[in-house]
Amino acid sequence: MASAVLGLTLRWVMFLSAVLLLLLPGASAQEPPGVGCSEYTNRSCEECLRNVSCLWCNENKACLDYPVRKILPPASLCKLSSARWGVCWVNFEALIITMSVLGGSVLLGITVCCCCCCRRKRSRKPDKSDERAMREQEERRVRQEERRAEMKSRHDEIRKKYGLFKEQNPYEKF
């Protein structure tokens, strides 16, 4: 089970690496820092997003400065379904959903791994009720052995008293 989860997690890591490699070329071709984002308004999305500090609004073909003080651009600036950042083919809604699913999957994978490890650790060590049952069984066995030895000694005394004691070598009498 843990190897399946590990394989699944490894696949997600490879998938995320591939996505990052796809996003990297768009982020690496940056414009010089002196150029403002508003100069790329009414041009193309690719030209606007060459500068990583720019945000392309597909709705009105505007290139805007990314609001760095907020994580997501406000709806007054541009709708999330129309906002593009990094690459032109991914909008913010899809990005948020994808990142949420990936984050949830990673958390779920970690939780499953932790639960599996805890279960294995617990199953290796007997719990208190099992230990108590084993201890009681051992005590009963010891008491039974004591009673058996006591009964054997009583029987041997009775045999000795009446001369029925079994000797080690029955041919010794002759």
Curated annotation (Swiss-Prot):
Its main location: membrane. It is found in: Cell membrane; Cytoplasm; Nucleus. GO terms for molecular function: p53 binding. It comes from the Eukaryota. GO terms for cellular component: cytoplasm; nucleus; plasma membrane. The keyword GTP-binding does not apply. Keywords: Cell membrane, Coiled coil, Cytoplasm, Glycoprotein, Membrane, Nucleus, Phosphoprotein, Signal, Transmembrane, Transmembrane helix. The modification Phosphotyrosine is found at Y171. Residues 127-163 form a coiled coil. Residues 1-29 form the signal peptide. Interacts with PTTG1. May facilitate PTTG1 nuclear translocation. This is Pituitary tumor-transforming gene 1 protein-interacting protein. It comes from Rattus norvegicus (Rat).
